[in-house]
């Protein structure tokens, strides 16, 4: 059991520290402090010893060296049950420090400011703080370490109840080491980012637990949601049940797809695959077009809207069962209508484009795969017409829309579209010709015709059978990467059927 008789307090985040220090004073705890923390305590009538008076050595180098002293670290690291430690501490007049309360210079807050300069970032790298935290954490059986103001109240209760158990101290030790590890990761990551080093030789990642989820992909799987250090979620939940693991995946997919398409785009997501995408002058029309692609699959889906959700659109959405909606904005009228369906989850995120993640992380059995996200786009100038039949300007618009949709569909992916809306989606088939047939059949099953449609394929056609199947379905024009050893055969098939075909030179596999 740790009995608190002497504490060292040096904090950047001064939340609740005055009240905590007053409690320590009232319970006979001697306080040692530094710099701004010392001034704050004394200004509030709290008895505290200045660190330089305690060590007999002044703060130097404009405060860069304050606590890096044997009297400090000996007091933190001394094992009082070890006779040799006790003898040496008595010989050198090093009192035991039972409690260290430290949180670190606000490096992350500093470098998050626009236009921060290198010198300012460097001056916010804490040296003494992490050293004290690590010393106390290493000696957790004899020294309590606190790094989070939210823990002060619990410790007050424990001190008043007789002391700190080893089990409790171990919990704070783990938290302390996580705190310093996170701090070092923030520093390392920032300097790598400044150097443009996207894939450093050593990758350190720190994520903060945002919430525990009810369960994972299935009820028997435990799950939690974590946020990375440098990216704070700007998803604003407005109503609805707590987000599940699967909800978060689908909301993320809806967000990414909508953000990379034109204004007033609506996409409907089911199990990470879009089952309808469209854009129009009004998001209500876009929603109606997107939903008609596959109204059966849209049941229980998540809707992404790059635009404002108004009352009419809210009414249309609530006529069917949906898990949730993510949009740039909801009008008061829309929110009032949605409030009658309180289980529908609503998330608002105003700036779709700026919130996009740069990297895609995939854990595998023996490591972590990291790649740049597939945000690269093409323009009309990148298209290469490879057939005898040439596209019109309307055809180009339709093909470009189809191409913008296909990269979000699981491979092998085929999508049939009009100029601004999907008609049939063939997703996730092991054979490309199967995806061709699946997309056409799904359109026909809901009464949509793919005659005269634009078709995008996420990768090249390895054989002419896919082209023959598209011609049979009635497609007008095809956009695909090209690059197959049988490109000549595929082009010949398109010419035989009088189809338009363009190559992009870019593949969009999605696993």
Swiss-Prot record:
<comment type="pathway">
    <text>Purine metabolism; IMP biosynthesis via de novo pathway; IMP from 5-formamido-1-(5-phospho-D-ribosyl)imidazole-4-carboxamide: step 1/1.</text>
</comment>
<dbReference type="InterPro" id="IPR036914">
    <property type="entry name" value="MGS-like_dom_sf"/>
</dbReference>
<dbReference type="InterPro" id="IPR024051">
    <property type="entry name" value="AICAR_Tfase_dup_dom_sf"/>
</dbReference>
<dbReference type="GO" id="GO:0003937">
    <property type="term" value="F:IMP cyclohydrolase activity"/>
</dbReference>
<dbReference type="InterPro" id="IPR016193">
    <property type="entry name" value="Cytidine_deaminase-like"/>
</dbReference>
<keyword id="KW-0658">Purine biosynthesis</keyword>
<keyword id="KW-0511">Multifunctional enzyme</keyword>
<dbReference type="Pfam" id="PF02142">
    <property type="entry name" value="MGS"/>
</dbReference>
<dbReference type="GO" id="GO:0005829">
    <property type="term" value="C:cytosol"/>
</dbReference>
<dbReference type="InterPro" id="IPR002695">
    <property type="entry name" value="PurH-like"/>
</dbReference>
<dbReference type="InterPro" id="IPR011607">
    <property type="entry name" value="MGS-like_dom"/>
</dbReference>
<comment type="similarity">
    <text>Belongs to the PurH family.</text>
</comment>
<dbReference type="GO" id="GO:0006189">
    <property type="term" value="P:'de novo' IMP biosynthetic process"/>
</dbReference>
<feature type="domain" description="MGS-like">
    <location>
        <begin position="1"/>
        <end position="147"/>
    </location>
</feature>
<dbReference type="Pfam" id="PF01808">
    <property type="entry name" value="AICARFT_IMPCHas"/>
</dbReference>
<keyword id="KW-0808">Transferase</keyword>
<dbReference type="GO" id="GO:0004643">
    <property type="term" value="F:phosphoribosylaminoimidazolecarboxamide formyltransferase activity"/>
</dbReference>
<keyword id="KW-0378">Hydrolase</keyword>
<comment type="pathway">
    <text>Purine metabolism; IMP biosynthesis via de novo pathway; 5-formamido-1-(5-phospho-D-ribosyl)imidazole-4-carboxamide from 5-amino-1-(5-phospho-D-ribosyl)imidazole-4-carboxamide (10-formyl THF route): step 1/1.</text>
</comment>
<protein>
    <recommendedName>
        <fullName>Bifunctional purine biosynthesis protein PurH</fullName>
        <ecNumber>2.1.2.3</ecNumber>
        <ecNumber>3.5.4.10</ecNumber>
    </recommendedName>
</protein>
């Amino acid at each position: 059991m740790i009995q608190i008789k002497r504490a060292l307090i040096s904090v950047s985040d001064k939340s609740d520290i005055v009240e905590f220090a007053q409690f320590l004073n009232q319970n006979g705890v001697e306080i040692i402090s530094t710099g701004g923390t010392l001034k704050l305590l004394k200004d509030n009538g709290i008895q505290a010893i200045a660190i330089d008076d305690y060590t007999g050595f002044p703060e130097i180098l404009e405060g860069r060296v304050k606590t890096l002293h044997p009297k400090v670290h000996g007091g933190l690291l001394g094992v009082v049950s070890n006779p040799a430690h006790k003898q040496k501490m008595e010989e050198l007049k090093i009192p035991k420090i039972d409690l260290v309360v430290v949180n670190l210079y606000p490096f992350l807050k500093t470098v998050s400011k626009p236009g921060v300069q290198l010198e300012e970032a460097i001056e916010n790298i804490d040296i003494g703080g992490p050293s004290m935290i690590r010393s106390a954490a290493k000696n957790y059986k004899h020294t309590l370490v606190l790094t989070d103001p939210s823990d002060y109240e619990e410790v007050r209760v424990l001190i008043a109840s007789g002391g700190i158990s080893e089990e409790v101290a171990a919990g704070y030790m783990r938290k302390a080491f996580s705190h310093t590890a996170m701090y070092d990761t923030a520093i390392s990551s920032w300097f790598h980012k400044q150097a443009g080093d996207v894939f450093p030789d050593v990758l350190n990642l720190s994520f903060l637990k945002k919430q525990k989820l009810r369960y994972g992909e299935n009820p028997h799987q435990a799950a939690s949601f974590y946020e990375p250090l440098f990216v704070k979620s700007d998803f604003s939940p407005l109503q609805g049940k707590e987000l599940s693991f699967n909800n978060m995946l689908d909301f993320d997919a809806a967000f990414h797809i909508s953000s990379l398409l034109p204004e007033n785009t609506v996409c409907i997501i089911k199990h990470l695959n879009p089952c309808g995408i469209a854009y129009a002058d009004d998001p209500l029309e876009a929603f109606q077009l997107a939903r008609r692609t596959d109204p059966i699959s849209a049941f229980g889906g998540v809707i992404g809207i790059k635009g404002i959700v108004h009352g009419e659109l809210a009414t249309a959405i609530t006529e069917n069962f949906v898990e949730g909606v993510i949009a740039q904005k909801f009008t008061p009228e829309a929110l009032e209508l949605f409030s009658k369906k309180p289980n529908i989850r609503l998330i608002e995120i105003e700036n779709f484009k700026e919130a996009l993640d740069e990297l895609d992380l995939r854990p595998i059995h023996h490591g972590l795969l990291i790649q740049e996200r597939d945000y690269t786009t093409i323009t009309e100038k990148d298209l290469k017409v490879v057939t005898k039949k040439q596209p019109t300007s309307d055809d180009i618009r339709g093909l470009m829309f189809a191409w913008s949709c296909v990269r979000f569909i699981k491979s092998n992916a085929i999508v049939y579209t009009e100029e601004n809306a999907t008609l049939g989606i063939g997703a996730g088939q092991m054979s490309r010709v199967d995806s061709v047939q699946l997309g056409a059949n799904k359109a026909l099953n809901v009464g949509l015709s793919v005659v005269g449609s634009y078709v995008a394929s996420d990768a090249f056609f390895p054989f002419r059978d896919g082209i023959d199947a598209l011609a049979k379905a009635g497609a007008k024009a095809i956009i695909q990467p090209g690059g197959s050893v049988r490109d000549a055969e595929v082009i010949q098939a398109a010419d035989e059927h009088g189809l338009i075909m363009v190559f992009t030179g870019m593949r969009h596999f999605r696993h």
